[in-house]
Amino acid sequence: MMEYSYQFTHAIVRQPAKSIIKGLRAVDIGSPDYDQMISDHKDYVDALTSAGVAVINLTALDKFPDGQFVEDTALCLPKAVILMRPGAPSRLGEVNEIAPKLRELFEDVYEIENPGHIEGGDILVTGKEILVGRSARTDENGVRQLSGIVIPLGYVMREVFTPSEILHFKTDCSLLGPDEILSTKRLQASGCFDGYKVVNVADGEEAAANAIRVNDYVIMPGGFPQTKAILEEHGYKVKAINN
């Protein structure tokens, strides 16, 4: 079992830029409130810090409205980092912005190359394997390139298929334990988590699945009291924050 799949010493975040109001949206729910986003970002950093990690806070990138979503630009493993190649054209340049910091932190750096596309939001590292969800942002070529990198490093990788109504694989799931997944019912129904223990979010609280296990805590979006209670009933310590 790869226990380190939720054990972290460091986290990289990026301050939201004022241009975030021009960012990509799966569903148009109106323009974000910049001041609120800054406040929410601070709460996120505080939650990470209280979970026991050292936070590396990168400066905002005004030319990349989605630049704060650093997860999509790289897959960080204990001994190597793989630079992604985002599927959204407006986000391609984000990788070059974060790469220098990652090269400082990792000795072994790999890259997904043109014409492949893959985003970190479609990759879930469990205690058994690396699950990669094919999606509108992650294509067959990108998945194949990633497989060619991580399998020689000793990992097991499995491709799954994200339902078309879901933007990223991890929009609807997150890791709770080495063999336990928090998931929406619609994603679980695809069969991608066969062989795992699955905790379903409450009906109507699907957005709560986009959480993150960091050491002893599950950091999840606020406003989903039923799912928070479900996680606590399963023995997890939960930090709910605005996001």
PLM feature segments, named:
Residues M1-N243:
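The feature marks the mature, well-folded catalytic cores of soluble enzymes
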